[in-house]
C-alpha cells in the first residue's frame, strides 16, 4: 500500500479538498483508503451521510491509536464512491498522547494488503500525530496558496521536514500550487519559488474554480481541470 500524506503547517490551503478529489480520481484504478487526522474532521463530513446505514458506530482514528487491541478492519467505512473506504476522524485526536512516530504505521500495517493507496489528511500542525503521518509516507504533498507569505511558510515547512528526517530518514515531498488565479502577483511569487529557491514544485497546479465550493457543499468530488495530469504526476513519483 502506497501512502500519500497531505500536510502543511498553514490552514486554509486546500488539504482536505485535495485529498477528496485526488482520491476520487485515483479510485478509478485503485482501491483507496482515506484517513482523517484533522481535528476538525472535515474530510469525514464529506462521507458522514454514509454512516447512517451502519447500525453500530465504528471506532474512529482516535480510538484506534489509543487502543491497539481494537481491530483496524472493523473501523473502516465503505463510502458511496466506488473503491473508496475511510476511517473517521475525531476532534479527540488533539488529546492523544502518542509515545513515538511509529504508532500510526504499525496500525496501518495491519490492513496494508487490502488497499493500493492510502491518503492521509493531516491537521495543520507539527504534532507527533502529524509526524507519524509524515514518517510513513511514500509521498508528502504540500498544497500552498501563492501569496506574500508563501516563502516564509515553506521555509517553516521544510525546516520541520528536515528536523523529522533526523528521526525517520529521508522524506519525499512535493509542493502543489493550489487555488491558482491568473494574477500577476501570483505569477511573480511562483517564479520566485521555482527559480530562486530549491523547492520541489510539482509542474501541475490546481486553478481556483467556482464549481469547487459548489461540489463540496454537495459532498461530491470535482473532476477538476488538469486533475488527471496531477494524478499522473503523483503516480510517477
Predicted feature locations:
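P-loop NTP-binding core
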Residues: 1-235
